[in-house]
Amino acid sequence: MPVLHNRISNDALKAKMLAESEPRTTISFYKYFHIADPKVTRDALYQLFTALNVFGRVYLAHEGINAQISVPASNVETFRAQLYAFDPALEGLRLNIALDDDGKSFWVLRMKVRDRIVADGIDDPLFDASNVGEYLQAAEVNAMLDDPDALFIDMRNHYEYEVGHFENALEIPADTFREQLPKAVEMMQAHKDKKIVMYCTGGIRCEKASAWMKHNGFNKVWHIEGGIIEYARKAREQGLPVRFIGKNFVFDERMGERISDEIIAHCHQCGAPCDSHTNCKNDGCHLLFIQCPVCAEKYKGCCSEICCEESALPPEEQRRRRAGRENGNKIFNKSRGRLNTTLGIPEPTE
């Protein structure tokens, strides 16, 4: 029986990936379809992906599959053919190819079985996830952006919206998709006569969100097919204006794809124009925040003076301090006040 999980350290795997000479292609895809036995499907897919040297993150559940992966360029077409042949429901599945890709997005394959492929918090037995809104293609998206009766709803987290979004799109302020769904219904109650256009990174969240809005009495609901990634690709291919401004946040080592030249966000430490996310270099913190090059040098990649000082301590002392510590929120949220370390320690007063 082959080993169906990784047994090599992350550091060794990352070093091996960085030493590779063959280019890689970053791909994302999802499909809502019934999987009778996610564990069996997971094990079969793990062997298929491993044989093709695929890295990335894959979630499976009874409701379908959600994947963000990195494939050696020479294996992309073989991967596509084998994926399509794996299950009739996957035949012809759209694969979103990354827009701004150095091929260094993942260095290990992690494949997990979950209750849902997107954590939505929905427990209504009458909810029909297949009753989705209408798809929009790139040209239709641009037409809707010029329609005064249309409202664009961003179904991504606040830190994704902060660095890039469609023109005049509404933010549903939340840290998670689970929090956003009820908020979207509440915020749109006064606009049921409007055309609701929902979007996300690659389509998986806005597809389910469109079904949730219809379940809650909204009848004019659309969502962008393939999300921001597919929209930007098709708009460029067709010579259309790209109406997404800024950067598209992605959940891998790149942390973003440049869509337009505009920088609409600011460094969370000094306020300078910047849209580069990073994780605090202190292993006891790892807060996700935006940091400009000047502050990165000043704070040595950390989110605060406290973390900067702690990360400079001997490794043994750092481990001692981390032991038993319960970290706080791992994502900086502008609405919660100024930037703070997640260590649960007050910043020194100035």
Swiss-Prot record:
It comes from the Bacteria. InterPro entries: Rhodanese-like_dom, Rhodanese-like_dom_sf, Rhodanese_C, TrhO, TRHO_N. The keyword tRNA processing applies. It is an enzyme of class 1 (oxidoreductase). Pfam families: Rhodanese (PF00581), Rhodanese_C (PF12368), UPF0176_N (PF17773). It catalyses: uridine(34) in tRNA + AH2 + O2 = 5-hydroxyuridine(34) in tRNA + A + H2O. GO terms for molecular function: oxidoreductase activity, acting on paired donors, with incorporation or reduction of molecular oxygen. One of its GO terms (biological process) is tRNA modification. PROSITE patterns: RHODANESE_3 (PS50206). CDD domains: RHOD_YceA (cd01518). Residues 146-240 form the Rhodanese domain. Signal peptide: none annotated. SUPFAM superfamilies: Rhodanese/Cell cycle control phosphatase. Belongs to the TrhO family. Catalyzes oxygen-dependent 5-hydroxyuridine (ho5U) modification at position 34 in tRNAs, the first step in 5-carboxymethoxyuridine (cmo5U) biosynthesis. May be part of an alternate pathway, which is able to bypass cmo5U biogenesis in a subset of tRNAs under aerobic conditions. This is tRNA uridine(34) hydroxylase. The lineage of its organism: Bacteria, Pseudomonadati, Pseudomonadota, Gammaproteobacteria, Enterobacterales.
